[in-house]
A protein has these predicted regions:
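A short, conserved acidic/glycine-rich loop-to-beta-strand motif
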Residues: 42-50, 413-423
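Catalytic-site signature of metal-activated, phosphate-bearing donor transferases
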Residues: 3-9, 28-169, 298, 451-452, ...
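A recurrent flexible, glycine/aromatic-enriched loop bordering the glycosyltransferase active site
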Residues: 75-80, 434-452, 468
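Glycine-rich, basic loop-to-helix element that forms the pyrophosphate-binding segment
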Residues: 1-12, 367-383
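Acidic donor-binding/catalytic loop of UDP-sugar-dependent glycosyltransferases
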Residues: 24-38, 396-409
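Short, acidic, metal-binding catalytic loop of nucleotide-sugar glycosyltransferases
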Residues: 329-338
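Short beta-strand-to-loop acidic/aromatic patch adjacent to the donor-nucleotide binding site
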Residues: 16-27, 386-397
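N-proximal low-complexity "stem/linker" segments adjacent to membrane-targeting elements
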Residues: 306-330
């Protein structure tokens, strides 16, 4: 290839300023001529460096399925980008090497580089055979045994062909050469030795990190090694070190994945294993941001979120002290319960709870006239930022780990905004847009007596002018308006007794309050 390029040089006219060596699978960016003409023409620059996009993570395709080159340049996702070096003056350089050919200065010239704004984009034909590369590289090494660059490329090509022993020996030869002084390429020789030498993998990766500590690739490979053997502290350290390096630079050795999802994924997994759950959550989100369609990364988010997710429980109470004690004892057995806020209607109810002394249980009284929605909002104001909020009546029986199951469902599916345990005999989950209203036969909607609101929606407040019912419907409407689902899940169950407090309200008075609430609710809904 070097001889062929030199033959082309000899065929060119003498009265030209620049030679752009452009392969058939490369495209010049718009405005290339103006960028090149802006380079000083005073003899101070004989090699113009430019931005070279070598590959693409995402292409834009035409309707017939072919690659839309201009569309990809405008809207595609570049992969490896580095500074190209194949634009030279007419007589300053010649080519050498049979393959992976390079420009070298001719006698009487010195290397004088300068930057320009020109861009070249590579659209590789991945179906093209590489079969000629290895014989040509072996020939280059034979003819130029002191050329460290050729030895490196030959060792790499041997690795691609699975000729492990020869490849490792060639990489070690590269490291021993007096001319092998460029740290990044030396480190990559160590990296590829590690890749092909499982028993010595850690040793060579550590040497590579020491040789080239400012490059991400070696640190990420070291983190991957520690992940593979379950050394979570090592994985955490190496991935953190990789992510601390924020200057990608413009070397041809950089790999897009090292600046994408992979180091964040490794750090998230290691942090999760070490119990550093907030860090796991942060970097899990970052990994997913780089690869939003990766199912494994998406699935991992459940574990990171669930490790830190907790629920605060809000229970209004007045007379049903026995029921309250029962449900509080059930809640205290559930590891996902963070705080239990008991909102007492009056001093008598508050005083009767002196025997509940667990630190998770906070007993409070509201001031002024008591109603259920005022109590719910009081609990909202007390709840911990970032926690889901579980609204619970004091006349409900919960199955074992009910809160944990509800929290898990919210963490697993971000589309759920409001969830309640199954309270009928049905076994399947149901998405609903209304409330229970005393229907326990499988046709009822969201249970106002046991419903959990997702943590990111807890800025909501119930309308306190509604005294008893229809506030639940207001909440359901709010969740649906936010584009979220209201789910009755069969993964958790509860049994609801008829409210002791409501049963003490005379039927006529109850009907009057409910009808008044309905009028106010309808009026508010029309206003929305």
């Amino acid at each position: 290839f070097g001889n062929a390029r030199n033959h082309l040089l000899d065929l060119l006219p003498n009265d030209i300023d620049w030679i752009i060596n452009l392969d058939v699978d490369e495209v010049l960016g718009d405005g290339w001529r103006a960028h090149l003409e802006a380079v000083p023409n005073d003899g101070s620059v004989n090699r113009a460096r430019y931005t070279y996009t070598w590959n693409w993570e995402e292409y834009i395709h035409s309707e017939d399925g072919s690659i839309d080159i201009q569309g990809t340049i405008a809207r595609g996702k570049p992969g490896l980008i580095y500074q190209g070096d194949k634009i030279t003056r007419r007589f300053s350089h010649r080519w050498m090497n049979a393959v992976h050919e390079v420009n070298i200065t001719q006698s009487g010239h010195q290397e004088l580089q300068g930057q320009c704004g020109l861009r070249i984009y590579h659209f590789a034909d991945n179906t093209k055979s590489r079969s000629s590369y290895l014989p040509l590289l072996l020939l280059d090494v034979e003819e130029n045994p002191d050329n460290d660059r050729n030895v490196y490329y030959c060792a790499r090509e041997l690795m691609f062909y699975g000729r492990t022993q020869e490849s490792v020996e060639m990489f070690k030869r590269h490291l021993l050469m007096p001319s092998s002084v460029w740290a990044p390429e030396r480190a990559f020789s160590m990296r590829y030795i590690a890749k092909q030498s499982p028993e010595e993998r850690e040793k060579w990766l550590l040497r590579g990190c020491g040789e080239y500590p400012w490059g991400r690739e070696l640190w990420v490979d070291l983190a991957q090694h520690y992940y593979d053997i379950g050394n979570w502290e090592g994985c955490y350290f190496a991935a953190s070190r990789a992510l601390s390096l924020t200057n990608r630079g413009d070397l041809y050795l950089t790999e897009a994945v090292m600046w994408g999802w992979l180091p964040h994924d490794l750090l998230a997994i290691a942090a999760h294993r070490l119990g550093r759950h907030q860090i796991a959550l942060e970097h899990g989100y970052k990994a997913l941001g780089h690869a939003p369609h990766d199912k494994r990364l998406s699935d991992n988010m459940f574990f990171y979120k669930n490790a830190v997710s907790m629920a605060d429980v809000v229970i209004p109470t007045k007379d049903n002290i026995a029921g309250l004690r029962r449900v509080v004892n059930q809640l205290l057995q559930d590891q996902k319960v963070d705080n239990i806020f008991v909102i007492c209607d009056g001093q008598e109810a508050f005083d009767r709870l002196d025997d509940i002394n667990d630190k998770k249980v906070k007993k409070v009284m509201t001031s002024g006239e008591f109603n259920i929605h005022k109590a719910w909002n009081f609990g909202f104001n007390l709840s911990k930022t970032g926690n889901h909020v579980f609204f619970l009546n004091d006349d409900v029986y919960l199955n074992e780990n009910c809160v944990s199951h509800l929290v898990a469902e919210l963490d697993r599916d971000d589309s759920i905004g409001l969830i309640c345990p199954q309270y009928s005999a049905l076994a399947q989950d149901r998405v609903v847009t209304d409330t229970c209203r005393g229907r326990y036969d499988g046709t009822g909607g969201m249970a106002g007596f046991a419903m959990m609101l997702a943590s990111d929606l807890t800025d909501y407040r119930f309308p306190e002018e509604l005294q008893l019912w229809w506030g639940d419907d207001h909440l359901v409407d709010h969740v649906v308006d936010k584009g979220r689902k209201c789910l009755i899940t069969s993964k958790a169950r509860c049994v609801h007794e008829h409210s002791v407090t409501i049963n003490k309200v005379p039927n006529d008075e109850l009907a009057r309050i409910v009808n008044l609430d309905k009028e106010k609710y309808d009026q508010q809904k029309r206003a929305r």
